[in-house]
Amino acid sequence: MKRLALLGALAAVLPPAPSNAQTVGGVELIELTIAEAHEAMLAGTLSARQLAEAYLDRIEAYDKRGPAFNAIIMTNTRALARADSLDDALRATGGLTGPLHGIPFIVKDNYDTHDMPTTGGSASLEGSMPADDAFQVRRIREAGAIVLAKSNLAEFAFTAMETVGSRIPGWTFNPYQLNRVTAGSSGGTAAAVAANLGLVGLGTDTGNSIRGPSSHNALVGIRSTQGLTSRDGIMPLFAHRDIGGPMTRTVEDAVRIFDVIAGTDPADPVTAEADARRPPSYMEFLVDDLEGVRIGVAGQLAFTETADPEILMRFAAALDDLRGLGATVVDDFAIPDLDSLRRGLGCSRFRYDIENYLATLPDPPVSTLEEIEEGGQVHVTVMPRVRSYLEFEGTPDTHEGCVRARANEERLRAGVRGAMAERDVVALVYPTWNNPPRLVGDLESPHGNNSPILSPPTGFPAITVPMGFVWDETLPAGLQIYGDAWSEPTLIRIAFAYEQATRHRRPPETAPPLK
């Protein structure tokens, strides 16, 4: 715990960010957006190499030194060569190679990458090389992106509460207060993007893991409709709930990525309808008014006995902001019998899913969950879950708990849809967390995690967007926006309008501009 005490002291004495900017290629690197980077690249003042080098310098300065966020498992040794090839292409053609040309990504280390190991944050899979890229990684590379680094995660994505595993020692720390958690499991991507160690990132979400860390790190995160984005090449936790998606500093950047990764993938049958369901571009829904939009307040999630009063104050202010944008906010919305509808939704199929994933690897270091358990190369906090998941027998189609969960999920979907139709609302809003980020090591105080309650078991989409800061303006809070299947256009419209009206996002002071 000496490390935690030192971090607490450091968090208290770190100076505010200096006023001088970190300029690269004529643009300000801190909080740089995709559009700003592309404008400078097309003007000839910024190269992809310059941009990648600038972020690599920040990783070198801040991830294992100084504040030591511990967000990055490894950087990509081929990143600069990739940047050079993109610069050559731009010089040759005068145009960008794609909508993500030269954009450095932080990718969670449960996405397959053909040129880097994929470990799921576990020493048991150290050096494990997949045969090819995950579908989403392939899509962003085809759009011109640079995979700059693989990020740390809660080992095997097991927990929403913290980011710690056996692949690299220690926790990943929250850049806003270094003695606080990032949440999990995509805490490495969240911390890195929040601290401007990369321009944007990819995370995954089974119950919380895009939206929770995004909220705790003042980011935007999108969990799509189940079936709109491919799971191919994502190391599974529970495959029926797993979704990958963007984690960014702005709604617009998240949507630019979402445009690239959403769609049908023959390798993932659940995406069969995706191309037919998605619009040509989600960018058209970046509008800054909400006239005619009816939004329900999910008070059953927000107004709990342990909810932090400052979070609720921020939530009340957010509701006023939505009204000011023209939305009709339905305060007394409720889902009948929600407590009973939430029961019996578990299907702990990790053993089945991880063994299917391991079978896709050309030379897996282990082939079964039993071998992972016997090898002992997992974090001490993870081993009890590994052993509990070993009890799963059969397949998700035959396992009694999974069969029961599917029926209960359908009841929950019907209950949510019925309540939304009754009140004629197109979206629900609630705090992403009812409580601010916990202290590292604290697994007892209230957390108020609302992300697993509606979106994962229904398969419906949700977006989190910064809602401001609490506790002397030091700890981030997030507003979550949830809707029916395929309602991403509406959710994006609400998120963008709210973001543009409030501008709550700000960078952490622990990672100031480099000189």
Positions of PLM-derived features:
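Bacterial N-terminal signal peptides
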Residues: 5-15
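Sec/Tat signal peptide C-region and signal peptidase I cleavage site
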Residues: 17-21
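Short, well-ordered alpha-helical
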Residues: 22-119, 123-126, 156-160, 271-274, ...
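Gly/Ser-rich, acidic/histidine-flanked active-site/gating loops
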Residues: 30, 111, 117, 243, ...
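Glycine-rich, small-residue loops and helix-cap segments
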Residues: 44, 102, 142, 198, ...
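Short glycine/serine-rich loop/turn segments
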Residues: 100-244, 269-272, 298-300, 428-446, ...
